[in-house]
């Protein structure tokens, strides 16, 4: 079972052979027994079994070289072991069905290399609950060295704007609402009264006219959060607030705006917010540092809370919905548990996540009102609430 051939070239030719269009040139002087070249797992995956009629033809030598190169390349992707094992199985099946290793390699090269081959294998990368948060480019735009694209994230943000504007336009057209409100007008009035009560309750020490200056901005923030958060509950849609950069940009812009309001109202005296009255002088530097860190972390906490709740909630619904879908196909004596139980689970989780999405808009708005109250009243908040 041993025969002579020429020396094998360096295995670095693997990358060139698979990812480029360079032809394979194999010069071998000695080819060991095929079991030396192919360990048990390789010979099983690629179905390389020596028989009594093997002769050292150039075609067989080239085929062995190609298989070794493919296996060495696959071995470099241990982090994607599941996809690599699937690739081995597919390649072995194609060879057993009559394709030559040279033809398989040419097909891999024509398809863009081994990376593309693995990625395009059906089932190589199973769908995960986090796939629903993937940002997918719809229209690619290149401006010089800048890469701009119209993505699904931008699309759903625009849809939210259009939906809110259309809702308020329908309610306020023809000079105002009806004396007997319909369902849409009742919804808008409910949002208006809800946000107005939050502003009046949470922001103290200001006249009604001054509070009205903050009301439109807070109302817009609440309305867009209210319509934006539950979007992910619609099948095949996208949750904008499930991305940390979006919520962080929103929270930082609000944080900067509130800080500007504080300086406009108090000037440099706004820094007294960092040092409560009556603090002993030795503790002042320590407390100023703590208050500064606490104040700056408000921007992070506002964004992280919304992002974490949306992402965790929607992921949980995805996971348990997949489990429920599997249970629906179980046919056994436990009919109620196997068929009706998962349906109730999905309905309950959907209602729960819908409530969480709406409540997060409420919590974010309350937090904004509290931060604005702190910036406008400084340390007078305690006396106001008392």
From Swiss-Prot:
Location(s) in or outside the cell: Mitochondrion inner membrane
Pfam families: ATP-synt_A
Entry-linked InterPro entries: ATP_synth_F0_asu, ATP_synth_F0_asu_AS, ATP_synth_F0_asu_bact/mt, F0_ATP_A_sf
SUPFAM superfamilies: F1F0 ATP synthase subunit A (SSF81336)
Transmembrane parts of this sequence: 150-170, 243-263, 270-290, 310-330
Membrane topology per record: Multi-pass membrane protein
GO BP term (any one): proton motive force-driven ATP synthesis
Signal peptide: none
Family: Belongs to the ATPase A chain family.
Matches recorded under HAMAP family: ATP_synth_a_bact
The protein, known as: ATP synthase subunit a
Provenance organism: Triticum aestivum
